[in-house]
Structures are given as structure tokens and as C-alpha cells.
Amino acid sequence: DLVRSRGLGDVYKRQVNDQWMYHTRLYAAANYVKTRDDLDLIQLNSFGCGLDAVTTDEVYEILTRSGKIYTCLKIDEVNNLGAARIRVRSLLAALRAHDRKQAVREILPSSIQKPVFTKEMRKDYTILCPQMSPFHFSLLQAAFNSCGYNLEVLPNDNKHAVDVGLKYVNNDACYPSLIVVGQIMDALLSGKYDLNKTAVVMSQTGGGCRASNYIAFIRRALKKAGMEQIPVISVNLSGLESNPGFKLTLPLVKKVAYGAVFGDILM
């Protein structure tokens, strides 16, 4: 709160969608701490909140990219804090060892370079879309393809996709995020697609749900797998992101709306 109230650590390009003031304070504090040799940060959170999966990943990236040690303590509603004390003592020991090395830190940005989906890419790129509703999404695929896109709805919404998602997504995140990211990564790792001619599309509401940060989950997974060159297209109506090669035109919106209605009827 002190860092945020004094405007410290504010100039920071985030990977994630900043949804709550709680997030804003954490990111501002981490961004300030990474610039100081006399400060370190311990993040405290509770068990079971999917939003914490977003913040822990982002704070970790901010600190570790600049050579700081990241520590997160999960504290449930219990009186015994013995485990937390052990973690703090371990952090202090690690800091002392780090100081003895006298390593010179380089302060780096933690944001991921976001490839843009251009008009030229629209001609020959395959756009992968995770399967979230078998009735609706088969119709949405036809709607997009009739408007000049080469969109493919993935058929791999199964347990294997979840297992792949567990490798690339913070395991405190919700189940839908695991299967969405898992489908995408499973497809990209299959060897079926040219990774230099493939993009990914995902909706982004911009609201309070962690689904607003599925885009960030996908980009982080692509980075872990060495596929940063793949554009991730955000489908949103609030101007969160834009791509010159992907536009929600009136004919496309009408076809998508028809597809949603017919999907409801068929279901």
C-alpha cells in the first residue's frame, strides 16, 4: 500500500490483465523492490484462489528476471505458523548466500514481447481455437472460415489435454484454464502444424473473472515451450488488445450470433 500510494513502481508493462487493486499493489511493490538491493518481497496468500495463480506467476516473473529471490507463503486459517517461519529462515539464508557471491544484478523488464497478427498473416496462417462447446464451436468455425479466416477448432478436449495443461499452467489455476491451455499446447507440440504459420485465438472478457487472463496463461505457456513467435489473438469488445489482421466485422458478428442461436437449438 505504501509503494502504491506514493506512486512508486507504477511504470510497468504487465503481461497480465490487471483486474483488481490487490493485483495492482502487488505488481507495483514487486516492480519497486526489483530496483532496490536493500529490499526483498514475500508474497502472502491463502489456498485455493485461482486469482492467486495469476499474481504469483506475475510477481515471480517481475522479481526473478531482475535477479531477485521470489518467496510465496501460503497461509491457511491455522494458528501454527511453523512452516512459514521455516520458509522465512530459508529465504534469509539464501539472501546471505546471494550477498556473499556479490553478483551484479541487471534490472530487466518482465513483459513478454507480443507478436501481432497482421493482415498478411491472415492469408496463410492457421488459427487454433480451443474447444469449449462442441455444438456451438463447430458452427463458429464455419462462420469464421466463411469470412476469410483459416480457423480450426481443436478436437482434443480430453484428459491428455489436461495433463499437458498441468505442465504449462500454474496448478493453482482453475480447471478450465488447464484444459484450454492444454488443448493448445498439445496441438502445437503434436508436429501437425507449422509453428511459423500458426496463431491462437481466445476470448477475453476484461471482467473480474480469471478468464480475462487466459491470454496471459497461453503466452506464458508458449514462452516456456520456446514458441514465443506464435501470435495470440484476443477476441474482446472492450479494446484490451487489437490485431490488424483480425477484425470483428458486422457480417462476421452476425454469423457468429446465428451460430450461437443454432448451437443452443441443437444442444
Indicate where each model-derived feature is located.
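Extended, charge-rich low-complexity interaction segments
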Residues: 28-48, 99-114, 181-190, 195, ...
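Generic long, charged, amphipathic alpha-helical segments
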Residues: 10-26
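Metallocofactor- and cofactor-centric catalytic cores in central/energy metabolism, strongly enriched
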Residues: 16, 23, 40, 82, ...
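Peripheral docking tails and interdomain loops at the edges
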Residues: 34-37, 45-118, 123-127, 219-221, ...
